[in-house]
Amino acid sequence: MGYSYTEKKRIRKDFGKRPQVLNVPYLLTIQLDSFEKFIQRDPEGQQGLEAAFRSVFPIVSNNGSTELQYVSYKLGEPVFDVRECQIRGTTFAAPLRVNLRLVSYDRDAAPGTIKDIKEQDVYMGEIPLMTDNGTFVINGTERVIVSQLHRSPGVFFDSDKGKTHSSGKVLYNARIIPYRGSWLDFEFDPKDNLFARIDRRRKLPATIILRALGYSTEEILDLFFEKIQFEIQDNKLLMALVPERLRGETASFDIEANGKVYVERGRRITARHIRTLEKDNVTKIDVPTEYIVGKVSAKDYIDLESGELVCPANMEISLDILAKLAQAGYKSIETLFTNDLDFGPYISETLRVDPSSDRLSALVEIYRMMRPGEPPTKEAAEALFDNLFFSAERYDLSAVGRMKFNRSLGLAEGVGNGVLSKEDIVGVMKKLIDIRNGRGEVDDIDHLGNRRIRSVGEMAENQFRIGLVRVERAVKERLSLGDLDAVTPQDLINAKPVSAAVKEFFGSSQLSQFMDQNNPLSEVTHKRRISALGPGGLTRERAGFEVRDVHPTHYGRVCPIETPEGPNIGLINSLSVYARTNNYGFLETPYRKVVDGQVTEEIEYLSAIEEGNYVIAQANASLDEDFRFTDAFVTCRGEHGESGLYRPEEIQYMDVSPQQVVSVAAALIPFLEHDDANRALMGANMQRQAVPTLRADKPLVGTGMEKPIALDSGVAVVAKRGGIIQYVDASRIVVKVNEDETIPGEAGIDIYNLIKYTRSNQNTCINQIPCVNLGEPIGRGEVLADGPSTDLGELALGQNIRVAFMPWNGYNFEDSMLVSERVVQQDRFTTIHIQELSCVARDTKLGAEEITADIPNVGETALSKLDESGIVYVGAEVKGGDILVGKVTPKGETQLTPEEKLLRAIFGEKASDVKDSSLRVPNSVSGTVIDVQVFTRDGVEKDKRALEIEEMQLKEAKKDIAEELEILEAGLFSRVRNLLIDGGVDAKELDRLDRTKWLEQTLNDEAKQNQLEQLAEQYEELRKDFEHKLEVKRGKIIQGDDLAPGVLKVVKVYLAVKRRIQPGDKMAGRHGNKGVISKINPVEDMPYDENGQPVEIVLNPLGVPSRMNIGQILETHLGLAAKGIGEQINRMLKEKQEIEKLRGYIQKAYDLGGGSQKVDLNTFTDEEVMRLAQNLRKGMPLATPVFDGAEEKEIKDLLELGGLPTSGQITLYDGRTGEKFERPVTVGYMYMLKLNHLVDDKMHARSTGSYSLVTQQPLGGKAQFGGQRFGEMEVWALEAYGAAYTLQEMLTVKSDDVNGRTKMYKNIVSGTHQMDPGTPESFNVIMKEIRSLGINIDLDEE
């Protein structure tokens, strides 16, 4: 493959044996597409805002004389861009305007005659917009809406697995779940009667529902049963025979016909008997009259003469009734066919317990159940039942629900709509009875064909609809008040409910989460997360094992590895690398189509429902050159996800890639296939907690997924169009766009402004650093600047560290690590953390708070870092307790003593009526002030500092826009110059003229003259655009800020803290091998090899065998080989060996092993080879893709090429004694991460602090400045030691003996060290609790 200029800088050697068939898709599609569907203009109105509006409008008044119709909507432009919203703490949103039409009809004229139409645009609140990276900025913080995995609408058949009833009998049930509306359940009870529930309420016999639908008893029996015909002839009974129905029964009489006995009495009827009966075509047999006794009549039999009901439907027939029927002249009788095996009499039995007899009584029963205590009327009962399942406003199955419903009942795809029909309900009951009879099986709730993804767009649409429904009620009320002549749509609509519903969803829904912004990976995974919790989902407590477990249908859709440890395990999942959602919201995964044993190029996405019908081969099945399977039998997944061996011609699909099973985070773990799943889970989760280091370092051993993640996360700057770097500095990159990518007549310049040292949600530092140089060519989609944790466009979460697996004086006991001082000196794991501290000046009852440097009772030194406005200056180094912003609050007037009054009269001192409420640096924090922002309310005078900041911002904005204009103008004029020179104007002549005069030249060639005029117009546009931009920017900077009620001023101070690595910090590898640093050892004491090179971290070898994460050992070996090759290249460069030798060696390294990637260095120029070699000096980056990685032989060959022992083990010497260790040690390079669990954030000690109100015990936790808990077990320990006095002070003066501890404090202050303990407060609490139970308890003080 050809490499671009940027890609040639550093090529990662790939060990993957299988060529990539499908590139990794854009990783944030699930978020962006969903929101796009929400705000797009959908002409069909099937989804998004359009669908919400169409479902609620038109709103018709109760008398039908007026209606409010929806015409269209449009979203305006947001006022501030994303960055400004984050700084100002506002929401990034666009105003929504809806065009509505109020139509009033003339009631006196013919129906439909229009009297008046008013059309108007109505403001409907603001809709938060998604940023380019799939997040929302709500009140200045970035949030992510996590997708939800919920039960798909449709019908589900299930059983209780014998757990409900003590007998262990399996009870089946069916549940119709709509997208919105009431649930309808059908269930069997232990007596085999069928019941129905609406909305999980009290159960009713299911036949009540059927009666309410208008079915009579006869019709009900007709729907659910087959019939047996009996004929009465000469006091004999003839039965119409269907031989199949006799299977398995015992004959209670001789079955004979045509004089031949087929089955003797008492014999069991077998399949052979049935075949003989069918062969002889026996259709009727004589039966004794007793045979009909106990059978159930299938319809009403009425004596036609007297009109008397002889035998109602569903009545058991006795000999008396048989005689009456014969007497009434009936020649044939129909009864229900039932048996115990596969035709149960369930509906017939249920009809017997059904209290209703006709439609009305059934409707009344339903009404009583839904609205207990209300007197039913016929209309109310009918309306209620109608609204439950048959009104489109109250009930909607949705397209998904209808599709699932029809599939389940075996109906055609297009049948039916969003509401239920009679046939639907009967169909569900029939299928449920079939399942009870042993035909068909229950659904698997955890199958991904029964669970679907609800993404941002859909959830926002639902919230929006809820808001609109609230508005609808208010509008209906207003319309029915009459007097509508002067009313416009704007008067009718109050947008508050809509914007409130939307705001609530984005701001405080369980699924709207504060974005995890530790590093680019954590951002990407957060956006790809799938939660089963949240509104309409499961709750942690109720979720059982089955829901959390890995299901075969997860394959390629949901990652089996990445899920949190703890109570949410299995409820929060991550999308697999290639997975996507289809139109119905079901997860699909791609497969290569296989035709006649040959794998084609065609790729198809299958959902879990479709996948069950195919035979699918794995990605690692071996293929020949023609993409045919080489093995006679291939391991595949067949029906229902069971794996087995199949012949090549039976295979229909094949996996796309070996890594399609896992998620993005798990795909970053090299040698994942050699790790135990539990450790892999920890590894995937801990990579998300890695803090971006000061200097990002690409992993030597990667998986090839590093690039796509870094690009898709949006932290790096990516070129929109190809071109040449025209200008680059730390904060801006300018690209001159290639001619073929520019639009005719534009300047062809792209300007990229970089983000410098801003704070992330997790207080880590976001900073972009250019990685291109002046004059370099770049292509579209290539990286121009690295963000946090990216290195040349690759994800770089940690550092490559030289590790040794060996014990070292117990310093690596229990997973702790011994770290060399060199790691600290080289700032390998130094990180920058940025904290935001804010000070708010409010308007209080006693007067306004003031931000000032004039603070009472504070010495000069404390104010030394503040300017005259009382705000700390940028660049000040501050530590715990320092004042950042001086603020005074008025306090109430106090009674003054005569002396004070006198002093005040003499000195006129008025300062004592304010108290100091300044913003100080928290105790455990120290750092440098890197930025200050001042926000002032409209109408409040700005202080000097605010004006300075404003001035600076204006200056910068002007400079930015002027430079931008300068660059664009230069680009434009260079094109003008070329055009003029082409048109025959002399170049020297041109250079003498002023540039603006160039545009006034005339050319003979008409086409060129037109082009020149176009360029002149553009120049004018540019100037106007510049003025406009400047004006807008100026307006934004100068205008007052929109602050919360009662707030006059907000000052935000940003502190940067540099954290070096130190004992107590948590570090981890990528294989779940985590540990805490126990000691930082001097370099000279660390073990070293024969070349005198010391190791940087010593790890405990005992951490490997029991954890079974062997991946870390393989990574260490491969890392050593990568470094070895780097060192060989470095040596060749130092010795200035000829380029061909260098080229040959690098080529040899790339060619080693059986990887499918081929790098041909002969196509590289010498300069490119040199640049590549320079980038490979520190080690050759390798990629070992998940499940398709490097093999043992390849690792050995690579070690050999690097001039290293193939065992991967080296003889080490003790740094303290210089003695050789007695056996070789595994040494190599492992990629280590520093996790966001820093000892600085956890260290805490309490002096005197706050106490809990009730128990009077100190609070707990660092945030509350709490104490250390001395719990039950610690008390036992002291008891065991018999340390009575220590125990006494622990339980009294050091805890909750209020008087005792005050006395103790006084004693310590006065220097008398004695203690007199009293009663602990907790004793008083228990006494009061006992009293509250009505038992009086008193202390006898002796």
UniProtKB/Swiss-Prot annotation:
It is an enzyme of class 2 (transferase). GO terms for cellular component: DNA-directed RNA polymerase complex. It holds the Pfam family RNA_pol_Rpb2_3. One of its GO terms (biological process) is DNA-templated transcription. Disulfide bonds: none annotated. It catalyses: RNA(n) + a ribonucleoside 5'-triphosphate = RNA(n+1) + diphosphate. GO terms for molecular function: DNA binding; DNA-directed RNA polymerase activity; ribonucleoside binding. The keyword Manganese does not apply. It comes from the Bacteria. PROSITE patterns: RNA_POL_BETA. InterPro entries: DNA-dir_RNA_pol_bsu_ext_1_sf, DNA-dir_RNA_pol_bsu_external_1, DNA-dir_RNA_pol_su2, DNA-dir_RNAP_su2_dom, DNA-dir_RNAP_su2_hyb_sf, RNA_pol_bsu_bac, RNA_pol_bsu_CS, RNA_pol_bsu_protrusion. Its EC number is 2.7.7.6. Keywords: DNA-directed RNA polymerase, Nucleotidyltransferase, Transcription, Transferase. SUPFAM superfamilies: beta and beta-prime subunits of DNA dependent RNA-polymerase. Belongs to the RNA polymerase beta chain family. PANTHER family: DNA-DIRECTED RNA POLYMERASE I SUBUNIT 2. DNA-dependent RNA polymerase catalyzes the transcription of DNA into RNA using the four ribonucleoside triphosphates as substrates. The RNAP catalytic core consists of 2 alpha, 1 beta, 1 beta' and 1 omega subunit. When a sigma factor is associated with the core the holoenzyme is formed, which can initiate transcription. This is DNA-directed RNA polymerase subunit beta. The lineage of its organism: Bacteria, Pseudomonadati, Pseudomonadota, Gammaproteobacteria, Pasteurellales. The gene is rpoB.
